[in-house]
Each structure stands twice: as structure tokens, then as C-alpha cells.
């Protein structure tokens, strides 16, 4: 599993074999899929390589596919044949997005209709607006990123939108830091876990869940 996203009705599970499986959130029954049934890779409209990130935003499913960001209409994703679910368009990032074959070091977060992605290689956060991505007269719509927040001294890893702020972990650090989603500026320290390297994070029912990249374990900590 590369990543998961949850909407009001569906659970999206992105796999490494060029496929996104969709389940009903209430019943957990399989609904549909995006991608080839044979799991083969390719460059055409129905093929993907690896799912590095998934987030739902305004009836759109945004998929981080290695160094590409694609958008899908959720209603098409749950009704069209798996190998014929078309994407709405792509996001063009000026400097490109760095990647490798470790999806665990790539983060995505949605805040107020904008999508944020950690770019470990370029030491930055990429920012774009999914609602700009529309199908116009049957043609794809490619959009550009709204902003790129640069961080010369750190390499971003995990990312989470919570309480009107962005929470971000950095490489070789047990720190989770708070950032302003409008400017990308550092606001302060949320928490620090010595001797750990924090990857993806989630907060639920007052608990912080995170991946300790050093140990390869899912950890939890009680919030304040």
C-alpha cells in the first residue's frame, strides 16, 4: 500500500501495482478501482507507476504518481470501468518533484481547498489548487503550482493539516514543527521525539499516530 485517503463515502487505497482500490466507507465492500487489471506499468492514460500519495479535495481525488500529480473526478472513479477512468489533468511543477522508490518519505495534505506536497529532494513544499483542474470540452486541464515554499536547511518528510496549521516532520529529526499554510513560515515546535525519524502522521481522537522511519513501526502519542 502506497497511501490511503478517506472521503465521506469512500476509502481509497493506493497500491504499488498501478492500481487504486475503492471501498465503501460504511460497509467496507469493494466498489471499483483505477488502473489496469493486470497491474502492468506504462505511460498511457490508463497506466500509473506507483501511488506515492492520495488525498480527496472537493469531489476530486488527487494522486501523487512518482513525480507526477494527477486529478480524478471521484464520481468517475467509482462508476467507470477500472481501466477507463480518465484523469482530469496534471499539475505542472516548475522545478519538477523529486522522488525515489520509498513512498513513505513523501507527504500530502489538504488545507482550505489547497493541496500541499513535501518534496524531500528539492527541500520544499509544493502548493496547488485542485479546483482549477477541470475538463473543458473533453480536454484535459493542466494546471501549475500556486507556490513553492523553500527550506534550505531541512528536508521535509511527513505532512499533516491540523488546527489551521501544517504539521511537518523533517529528515534526521524527531521534531514535528508547525508551519503557516499561507506563507510556509515556521511557527514553532509541536513535539519532539528523540532518536526517532518521523514519516507520515495522522491525528485522531486526541492521539498522534506516526511512522518511525528508523524502527519501521507505527507509533502513537497522546496529544495535549
Which positions does each model-derived feature cover?
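Beta-rich, blade/repeat-based domains predominating
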Residues: 1-7, 39-57, 94-111, 148-163, ...
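Conserved core beta-strand positions within WD40 beta-propeller blades
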Residues: 10, 60, 114, 165, ...
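Conserved beta-strand positions in repeat-built beta-propeller and related beta-rich domains
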Residues: 13-18, 63-67, 117-123, 168-172, ...
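Short loop/turn segments that connect beta-strands within beta-propeller blades
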Residues: 24-28, 76-80, 129-133, 180-184, ...
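Short coil/turn linkers that define WD40 beta-propeller blade boundaries
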Residues: 28, 69, 80-82, 123, ...
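Beta-propeller fold detector
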Residues: 30-38, 82-94, 135-149, 187-192
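Blade-level signature of beta-propeller repeat domains, shared across WD40, Kelch, NHL, RCC1
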Residues: 196-224
Amino acid at each position: 500500500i502506497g497511501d490511503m485517503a478517506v472521503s465521506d463515502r469512500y476509502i481509497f487505497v493506493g497500491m504499488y501495482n498501478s492500481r487504486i482500490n475503492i471501498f465503501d466507507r460504511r460497509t467496507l465492500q469493494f466498489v471499483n478501482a483505477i488502473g489496469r487489471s493486470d497491474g502492468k506499468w506504462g505511460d498511457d492514460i490508463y497506466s500509473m507507476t506507483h501511488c506515492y500519495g492520495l488525498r480527496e479535495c472537493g469531489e476530486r481525488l488527487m494522486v501523487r504518481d512518482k513525480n507526477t500529480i494527477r486529478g480524478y473526478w471521484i464520481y468517475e472513479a467509482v462508476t467507470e470501468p477500472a481501466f477507463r477512468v480518465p484523469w482530469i489533468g496534471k499539475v505542472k511543477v516548475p522545478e519538477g518533484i523529486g522522488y525515489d522508490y520509498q513512498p513513505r518519505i513523501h507527504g500530502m495534505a489538504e488545507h482550505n481547498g489547497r493541496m500541499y506536497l513535501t518534496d524531500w529532494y528539492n527541500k520544499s513544499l509544493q502548493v496547488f489548487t485542485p479546483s482549477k483542474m477541470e475538463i473543458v470540452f473533453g480536454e484535459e486541464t493542466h494546471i501549475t503550482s500556486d507556490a513553492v515554499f523553500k527550506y534550505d536547511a531541512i528536508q521535509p518528510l511527513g505532512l499533516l493539516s491540523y488546527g489551521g496549521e501544517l504539521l511537518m516532520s523533517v529528515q534526521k529529526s524527531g521534531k514535528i514543527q508547525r508551519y503557516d499554510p499561507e506563507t510556509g513560515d515556521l511557527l514553532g515546535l509541536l513535539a519532539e521525539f528523540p532518536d526517532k525519524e518521523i514519516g507520515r502522521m495522522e491525528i485522531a481522537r486526541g492521539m498522534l499516530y506516526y511512522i518511525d522511519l528508523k524502527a519501521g513501526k507505527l507509533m502513537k502519542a497522546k496529544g495535549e
